[in-house]
Amino acid sequence: MQNKLIVKKLGRQDYEPVWKAMHKFTDERTDEDVDQIWLVEHNPVFTQGQAGKAEHVLNAGDIPVIQSDRGGQVTYHGPGQLVAYFLINIRRKKFGVRDLVTHIENLVINTLKAYNIDSTARPDAPGVYVDGKKICSLGLRIRRGCSFHGLALNVDMDLSPFQRINPCGYQGMEMAQVSQLGGPSELENVEQQLIQELVELLGYDQVDIQATSNITAEA
């Protein structure tokens, strides 16, 4: 059972309830509980990471700003962006934190490669980039040997809210998205490719994919 993965496709959700459910799952899970990946599309929100500074939120306007406990600084989530939360027992997987970050970056790079999009990671700024533009943000937290939070991949979204912040603390950071680079505009398409790459890269033997809008965090 321990090398099984549950993938929950949660659809469109507000950020805060999902964040609280991640906490609950991580706080209550045992060494026997199966790892989970949650795939979700959030309603518009800015989230500040633990290193976030108020001055990097330039003009939030009508979009709420939520203080999160993930790594990194401020980013934007909104419709048309694929967010994946990695609820993984990294102690059981024998991953270090840097190993997990590298695996996630490679997962995104391989997913984009399937659409003939060449992308790279950067040693100075976690995430994935295409020609210097950021296409995927990444922020994690580890508690009790288990990860939570994850990645946000821009698929087919309104990128203009990123101009209201310094994304991940970088002034003038330009953003890219899959649909503008010849890839698909449907999140479902990208989800399927991401799951396929993830199972291969992280070495799970069995995958249970569940489509549900219920975010109760039972293993």
Curated annotation (Swiss-Prot):
Pathway: Protein modification; protein lipoylation via endogenous pathway; protein N(6)-(lipoyl)lysine from octanoyl-[acyl-carrier-protein]: step 1/2
Residues flagged as site, Lowers pKa of active site Cys: K134
InterPro entries: aa-tRNA-synth_II/BPL/LPL, BPL_LPL_catalytic, Octanoyltransferase, Octanoyltransferase_CS
Miscellaneous remark of the record: In the reaction, the free carboxyl group of octanoic acid is attached via an amide linkage to the epsilon-amino group of a specific lysine residue of lipoyl domains of lipoate-dependent enzymes.
Amino-acid positions noted as binding substrate in the UniProt annotation, renumbered to this chain: R70, G71, G72, Q73, V74, T75, Y76, H77, S137, L138, G139, G150, L151, A152
Taxonomic classification: Bacteria, Pseudomonadati, Pseudomonadota, Gammaproteobacteria, Vibrionales
GO molecular function per UniProt: lipoyl(octanoyl) transferase activity
Pfam families per UniProt: LplA-B_cat
Organism: Vibrio atlanticus (strain LGP32)
Source taxon at top rank: Bacteria
Keyword terms: Acyltransferase, Cytoplasm, Transferase
UniProt domain BPL/LPL catalytic: residue ranges: 31-206
EC number(s) stated in the UniProt entry for this protein: 2.3.1.181
Family: Belongs to the LipB family.
Listed GO CC annotations: cytoplasm
Catalyzed reactions per annotation: octanoyl-[ACP] + L-lysyl-[protein] = N(6)-octanoyl-L-lysyl-[protein] + holo-[ACP] + H(+)
Biological role stated in the UniProt entry: Catalyzes the transfer of endogenously produced octanoic acid from octanoyl-acyl-carrier-protein onto the lipoyl domains of lipoate-dependent enzymes. Lipoyl-ACP can also act as a substrate although octanoyl-ACP is likely to be the physiological substrate.
Compartments in which it is found: Cytoplasm
GO BP field: protein modification process
Protein name: Octanoyltransferase
Catalytic machinery residues: C168 (acyl-thioester intermediate)
